[in-house]
Amino acid sequence: MTYDKMATDRSRGLNDDEIIVRRKQYGDNVLTPPQRVSLWKLYIDKYRDPIIEILIVAAVISLVLAFIQNDFIETAGIFIAIFLATTVGFYFERDAEKKFRVLTTLNEDQLVKVRRNGKVTEIPRRDIVVGDVILVEVGDEVPADAELFSAINLQIDESTLTGEPLATKEVLDNDATAAAQQQDFSCDHTQKPASSHESTYPQNLILRSTMVMNGHGEAVVIRVGDNTEIGKVTILSNENTHVQTPLNLQLNRLARLISQAGAIVAFVAFVAFLVHDILTNSIWHSHDYLGMAQIVLNYFMMAVTLIVMAVPEGLPMAVNLALALNMRRMLKSNNLVRKLHASETMGATTVICTDKTGTLTENRMSVSSMLQADVPARQNHLDFNAKSWDRLFYMALAVNTTAELDNGKPIGNPTEGALLMWLEQQGQNYEQLRKECKIIEQKPFSTNTKYMATTVSVDDKTYTFVKGAPEIVLQMTNLSGNDCLKVKETLFSYQKQAMRTLAFACCEGCFCSNNLIYQAVTGIADPVRNDVPAAVNQCHQAGIEVKMVTGDTSATAIEIARQIGIWPKEDNAEETEKHVKEWHITGPDFSNLTDDEAYKRAKLLRVMSRARPADKQRLVELLQKSGEVVAVTGDGTNDAPALNYAHVGLSLGSGTSVAKQASDITLLDDSFHSIASAVMWGRSLYKNIQRFLFFQLVVNLSALLLVLGGAVIGTEMPLTVTQILWVNIIMDTFAALALASLPPSREVMNEQPRKPSAFIITNSMWRGIIFCGTSFFILMLLFLVWCERHGQGSIIDVHELTLFFTTFVMLQFWNLFNAKSMGSVHSAFRHFWRDHGLVLVLVLILLGQWLIVTFGGRMFRTLPMSLTEWLAIIFATGTVVLGSGELWKGINRIRRKTKAL
């Protein structure tokens, strides 16, 4: 619904009755806050993990068997594993959410000036209604979307909404206004803007959440609350996108594989043993149906045991511990991770779509270069030396401006603020310089004249200072010959670098439009952050493509892209034209492409300028459709929809509340370099999860084979339920802590991103799991045979079973070293003493095993062992497991060196 601004009396504003009617008709000026997830729902969500779901099924089956056998220890262990895994994830996400809420508080009670009942008054922002006449001036935040009917030198900082740091606003004629009103500026990417090709929003509209940087104006409110441009963007940013993270996809796939493999093995084992029993056991030829049922039940329980043992109980705990520890560590490096899986997903990222203003640049205009004129020759009675000439220029900068500085921060026009900051850098106090001058007359800047002039009295002399567009100001000066050529070449150089250019001139006496004395030209820009080019280069080395999506002009966007390294620094005119056609597009042009055309362009794009929120969101969706894992960075409200739709959204700590709410990670230090660090953390985390999977599945496979082996030879399981509980849950928890606490490796940044479709268990991991699991089973089986033949009698006693249990645990203990160095040619002992978490866990496992063996007694079916037995088992298992692992890595190191030669 479009409001007719003519329905408001501009001179009087709305009366009390009209306010009530408008509030009922159009609503309040309040943005609907994002719906908070209740603590209960957040906790329940943790049970939707695919591995957890399998564990719950296993726990239920185990519970049924527990009632039959009257043994609840294993069942309790599985339920404990489920509880711990879900609670860890819930606790850390809730903790991060608490920290995050502090960053996203929204103030709807901010006072704004309105004209009501013929008087100017201040009311809270929430009380504004459609049709209100609002008054805005320097420093104000625009409270609602409004249409200007009066504007004096009005300039708006739209960087939070469009990426454009300074937009000049003016009153349009009726035809232009009508065209602007017919346009939807936010959500429909099939519309084309009514304004110019290089404009994001019409010049007569001021939008909620933008800041007034210069001038003042009056406007009629046309949209409030969720109907404002920022309201539409907020709704988009809060939509549930249902985008699954790469790790979720991999864990789903692993869960299906484990459940299928476990069911198949259990079914085959059940059928095989039952058929063998039918063929060899005479009971099947009798009428003892109760005995037959007992045999079937025994084999069925064995099959269920196989299914339960196939499930890696420690995996959810390991994943959540790894993610949670990463959250804590990344917070220390100024990355506030809100969602557990976001830290790992950064490691799978293939494309980063980044905003420009505030993300790549400092969002602070500064003087990049200044070309000052030499001391002029004597003219009439004007005679300057170097000191007096510089002082006159400093005075020109101090008085011929509308800006101020507040503790070094510009207030007002950011371009003029940059000049004052440059003045301070030269050791000049602009306030003191102003005190030395008396302003006689001031001619403000306007879009028609394109210059500003100030006449002052200094030391009983009158001077006029002029500042403005170089093409206007230089025509007023006496500049000629080589001096003129040098200035024009300098200006051309500034413009090539997408700088804003200004020229300065002066004269004695009142203003005259010719024969001014040229003082200087300057190039002003929003500088690139110092660490950005190196961070972009790091991303490129890691195989990640960086795309810039900004609301700024094409020339500025391409130049910044060139400075940070996503656009060639040197190319001729022909190449530049070719690159612009392939790698660059404006938001309006992108919105006019069909879905097929946009899909093809999305992969090639490096820079999108004049982008609107829907354009960014569409680009992200198309990249995801093409199989890319997309991270989006941004600080403005305009970035929020894309942040929400991306696999990982990264907002800046200084960004808007809407952007932060839509993101998964907040960069507290506003540094793009933190993104490269997040990628390194994510990739290292994924490797740590793979290491734990290797370790856990070796344990499960060897235990599974022992159950099968015991059934084949007709003996009871040599490991008790409590012993398996120690191996599968407690020890695995220690292993999860150890492997999750391994520090990130910078070597991962030299690798290409993994394919989203690549299974979390690689072929080499499968080979290692099968080899180690089978080897451990064979070793333990041989150990059982040795115990039978060399023990006291044919029955294996408790002492021998204790030796068996300790040997099995020590095999897994040493295998932890192999897991640590998995996928690397480096020794498992490389940086060993730096991995404090691993060292501590190894000590805890040894201590725990000693306590269980020494004091476990009947509960763990153990007897104390002598020191000789301890040393023999530790040395023997270490030699076999660690020795073979180190030998294999040594062979691989030699192979790599041979290939390099």
Predicted region positions:
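Hydrophobic alpha-helical transmembrane segments and their immediately adjacent juxtamembrane loops
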Residues: 755-769
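Alpha-helical transmembrane segments of multi-pass integral membrane proteins
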Residues: 767-783, 810
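Membrane-interfacial loop- and helix-cap regions that link adjacent transmembrane helices
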Residues: 793-801
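Conserved cytosolic headpiece of P-type ATPases
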Residues: 1-753, 760-761, 774, 789, ...
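Generic alpha-helical transmembrane segments
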Residues: 731, 776-777, 801-817
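Juxtamembrane and boundary regions of transmembrane helices in multi-pass small-molecule transporters
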Residues: 782-792
